[in-house]
Design a protein with these regions (language model features):
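Bacterial N-terminal signal peptides
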Residues: 1-9
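N-terminal alpha-helical modules
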Residues: 11-126
């Protein structure tokens, strides 16, 4: 059974090197988004840790505003809502058709990679 699963995974990976059908393209777009999301989650952990550490270095005894991490978390939650709504809207170009999931996944992958770069830059410049 394990050998079959490995074979199927390898076959799916090979398909994404040169997808030929709409189904293949949709599957590959989903995998691309999943990979981008994994990268985002890894970068989020790095950036969040950095911002928490930065917050701890500040004297906020006279400052009641939220800290760096708290505002970043709020922004990230808003960004996730934006990304999902925006990409759902982008998919409506082919609403109900077989192209819709490909458009949504491709949009999510693109925006997720852009956000990952933003988070990386935040961690590197602060």
């Amino acid at each position: 059974m394990t050998g079959l699963l490995f074979f199927l995974g390898a076959a799916a990976s090979a398909v994404c090197d040169d997808p030929q059908t709409q189904t293949d393209m949709t599957i590959c777009a989903g995998k691309d988004y999943a990979a981008a999301d994994e990268e985002l989650n890894a970068q989020w952990a790095i950036t969040a840790k950095h911002m928490k550490e930065y917050d701890n270095t500040l004297d906020r005894s006279h400052d009641t505003r939220p800290g760096y991490f708290e505002t970043l978390l709020k922004a990230q939650r808003a960004w996730l809502s934006y990304r999902d709504a925006h990409c759902t809207s982008a998919g409506y170009y082919a609403r109900g058709g077989s192209l819709e999931p490909l458009l949504v996944s491709s949009c999510k992958a693109e925006l997720t990679r852009e956000r990952t770069a933003q988070l990386r830059e935040l961690a590197e410049t602060n």
